[in-house]
Amino acid sequence: MKKKFIILLFTLGMLLTPIKSQAYDTNAGFTSMVNNIQIEPLKKEYHLINGHNGMKTFMSYTAITDKTSNQYALQQMAYTDEMGFRKINNRYCVAIGTAFEAPVGQIFNVELDNGEIIPCIVGDIKDDKDTDASNVFTSQGCCLEFIVDIPRLDGIIKTLGDCSSKCDEWNSSCFQYVIYDINYLEKGEDKWNG
């Protein structure tokens, strides 16, 4: 009985995580609160291999031109923030590889080695020919490509080709992806804050 109780506590500990204001987008509309504990519908966690160089590249949102695609539909709902990043509900629109099995519109967080959390939404899927054999990293060692409005993007980011210079907290390698069982396109924009 004692062993079952310990396993139950361990399982509950994995499901219930303390609130961290810097770690969660409180406007995301997909969390539940119980006694100051935040419960989120977790789908998968992916721990990234060591040796990732930390580079976070960018692509122009205007490169998404197929008007029949989910990528295009999502960009019609997105806005450009003051630094040139495309966002939906304070989540960064990004392109990721197929290894994560996350379709366009999927909500996820990227945890960096330094503990910083970047709230993201899948805005595009990297073609397998543009990633390594694991379908995670590009030839530049990037596993997270931000979708941006290039004319509005900060000059230093454009010069370096790396979004890590957005702020000191982002100057760290990606440690893991936490993918939630929520898809913005399936839930619908009108129901997002409900």
Indicate where each model-derived feature is located.
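Solvent-exposed, well-ordered loop and adjacent helix/strand elements within mature globular domains
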Residues: 24-194
